[in-house]
A protein has these predicted regions:
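Accessory RNA-recognition modules of RNA-modification enzymes
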Residues: 1-170
Length: 170
């Protein structure tokens, strides 16, 4: 079952506005509606609950999570998937437009191994990753490379891993 919030009667005073255009569809940044300081509190509680209540593990007091100085562009590796079955967002479906380009380079939709959300900008890895991914995508379009059909396993392009270092090397 799926649901979509259509109206909020009152927003939490700690709610944040998600900065990613793909928020709510991608699944990569599920916590963006909370400020980072609040995310850490809830993640701490989740870890403790998983260990104590679910795992039945008696623990001494757990030290607080040490937050990162970076809340954007902090990952050093991302794996993108190519697919010939691009996921259409609810907004795209509502527009009732026929899309000529159904290929995508991006991330799997949560719960759908064969559907990939086309990512234009990802805030998880340094911006050079976005430029590389989009350049490879454009090159593949221009040269008519086939994107994989994840069900039949036919197609040339399947995955792309981009790894960066703190020095900016690729």
């Amino acid at each position: 079952a799926e649901a979509e919030a259509v109206k909020f009667h009152e927003l939490s005073p700690v709610r944040a506005v998600p900065f990613c255009q793909h928020y709510g569809v991608c699944g990569g940044c599920k916590w963006q509606v909370l400020p980072y300081s609040e995310q850490i509190k809830y993640k701490q509680k989740q870890v403790e609950d998983n260990l104590k209540r679910i795992g039945k593990i008696e623990l001494p007091e757990i030290s607080p999570i040490l937050g990162s100085a970076k809340t954007e562009f902090y990952r050093n590796k991302l794996e993108y998937t190519f697919s010939n079955k691009r996921w259409l967002t609810n907004d795209e479906v509502r527009q009732d437009v026929k899309y000529d380009q159904m290929n995508a380079v991006g991330f799997h939709i949560p719960g759908a191994f064969d559907k990939v959300l086309a990512i234009e900008k990802c805030w998880l890895q340094d911006d050079i990753s976005n430029r590389i991914r989009n350049a490879v995508r454009d090159y593949a379009y221009e040269h008519d490379y086939s994107f994989i059909n994840l069900r039949s396993q036919e197609g040339m392009l399947r995955n792309m891993i981009i790894r960066t270092s703190s020095t900016g090397e690729l």
